[in-house]
Amino acid sequence: MAAYYLAVDIGASSGRHIIGHMENGKMVLEEIYRFENGMVKKDGELCWEFDRLFKEVVNGLKKCKEIGKIPVSMGVDTWGVDFVLLDKNDNVLGNTVGYRDHRTEGMDKEVYKAISLKDLYARTGIQKADYNTIYQLMAVKKKHPEYLEQAETLLHVPDYFHFLLTGQKTCEYTEATTGQLVSPITKDWDYELIDMLGYPRKMFQKLIMPGTGIGHLSDKVREEVGFDLEVVAPATHDTGSAVLAVPANDDDFIYISSGTWSLMGIERKEADCSEKSCEMNFTNEGGYAGRFRYLKNIMGLWMIQSVRHEVNDAYSFAEICAMAEEAKDFPSRVDANDECFLSPDNMTEEVKDYCRRTGQKVPETLGEIATVIYTSLAECYAKTAKELEEMTGRTYSRIHIVGGGSNAGYLNELTAKATKKEIHAGPGEATAIGNITAQMLKAEEFKTIEEARTIIHESFGVKVYK
């Protein structure tokens, strides 16, 4: 009988439980449970509902029992940078504030009193983003110093769910690197940096690598769901899992992990922490097996998702793509990475305002708005591809687009045209596939990453755009 492996993949807008197993030499997936996610306002702060989300994680486990497909292991992956602080009784200190909250405004200046941006990049190789853990912790230090005094443990979001499942406190490496407090040389916390910033050392747990067994379900969870399994750390940063699932058998490719965010980059063995890399705003996030994801964060499909919500989700993404294609000659462009698009009150109005401010034709219809966003994204991808080639001295022949955004056919066509490269789109479920792959590698279903990627290609295929 085939062994089942469970990926719990929680994104910024939804979470899913996806079961995977091997059948006739191919990986087979089944989504068995889905739930909503999103930030809510609490005490004037944008917060995640972790208690509710954990109930949903458990509900999905109960569903496994219900359908008679009990996994041998599971792992949770989420977005990066966000965390909880626990006191000595393992209670959460303060609100579970999310990365789109404004509490980090001005915190970069506070950090730079201790270390310059240039030196910080040289130490960590992580691109500056106001929501990084390093700045969020500074916000806690300035606004709630008592939390840092009481804190015994810092856990990033997937680590917190693994703790609630098993009672074991761990910090997984790929997720930790997103926060800008890990050394790419030692692949451990940069304790000297942590001391410089006045963050308590004791909060930071030992880092573990993806593929590490964390433990079995706690008695409480086991009784509730009716079975036991091993919790295995995948690359818990969702992009780390998605990149593991890129269906390539060589290194002649750029990838885009396309979802709420677009993470565009390459895999490399060593980090590039040079001044030029810093100026170009590339980041060196941790990957599976000690590799680095050398990439750039691009706003991604967040803009389209927001616009869709503003018309009450009346249209599918495919329908919006079709409308955009009809308005394809609309001339205006926006900078997809402009801060104004990070958390606006109304994305549609923000796009119009940007065009107004920059003296361009203002889009009016949904199709025009969508074509401005898609075309701007494709041009941003083309610019980033050129920068990657400049930084590495290489020319890449193709771009692999994985994740939910790989289904946006119109955007893929625009990207092929803008980059003049072959686009290989798929698999759409890359994050869950990568999560399951890390578990399968631990269980020796595959011997190497290369074998796993070949099987992923054979199992799910790709759609090529030229």
Language model regions located:
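N-terminal glycine/serine-rich phosphate-binding loop of ATP-dependent small-molecule kinases
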Residues: M1-G94, A122, Q150, R222-V231, ...
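Active-site core segments that coordinate phosphate-bearing ligands/cofactors
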Residues: L6-A7, I19, Y112-G125, Y135-H156, ...
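Short acidic-aromatic active-site loops that bind/stabilize oxyanions
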Residues: L46-F54, I126, D130, L207-G211, ...
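Short beta-strand-loop/turn "lid" adjacent to the catalytic site in phosphate-handling enzymes
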Residues: E66-G98, Q127-Y131, H162-S183, K206-M209
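Short glycine-rich phosphate-binding loop at a beta-alpha junction
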Residues: I70-T78, T153, K206, R394-G403
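Glycine-rich beta-strand-to-loop/alpha-helix junction loops that act as flexible
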Residues: D77-D82, P210-G211, S258-W261, R398-S406
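Carbohydrate-associated surface elements
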Residues: D101
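A conserved helix-loop-beta module that forms one wall/lid of the active-site cleft
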Residues: Y191, L197-G211, I436
